[in-house]
């Protein structure tokens, strides 16, 4: 078990949860994000399917600005993983997406209006 500082409860420490908790701690401790602007396992508003975003980051006005999709370290980050996070973003329409397995991280900036994206160096 590990204490999730966002949900304020202990959760089962699976490999994916290890990645999520380490990324959350990085956001708070290194990125300076206030815990109150970070959501965990937030339900996607796009579809009626029971899908949840691993991490959703808001700006200081409360608007969502970034989705983080966490995978277990043994999962290869491929097109299927990106398709998943892009699908989640149809409901949130955030400008930034991050995919991580704790070992490899990809970030991209989304230009929703022009249907383009740009990978960022992280």
Model-derived features: positions:
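A short, conserved, highly charged catalytic patch centered on acidic carboxylates
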Residues: 1-96, 103-122
């Amino acid at each position: 078990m590990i204490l999730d500082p966002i949900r304020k409860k202990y959760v089962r420490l699976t490999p994916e949860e290890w990645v999520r908790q380490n990324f959350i701690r990085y956001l708070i401790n290194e990125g300076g994000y206030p815990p109150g602007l970070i959501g965990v396992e937030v339900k996607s508003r796009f579809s009626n399917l029971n899908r949840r975003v691993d991490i959703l980051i808001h700006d200081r006005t409360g608007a969502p600005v970034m989705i983080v999709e966490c995978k277990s370290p043994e999962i290869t980050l491929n097109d299927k993983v990106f398709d998943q996070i892009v699908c989640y973003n149809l409901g949130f329409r955030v400008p930034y997406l991050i995919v991580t397995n704790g070992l490899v991280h990809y970030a991209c900036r989304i230009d929703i209006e022009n249907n383009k994206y740009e990978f960022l160096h992280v």
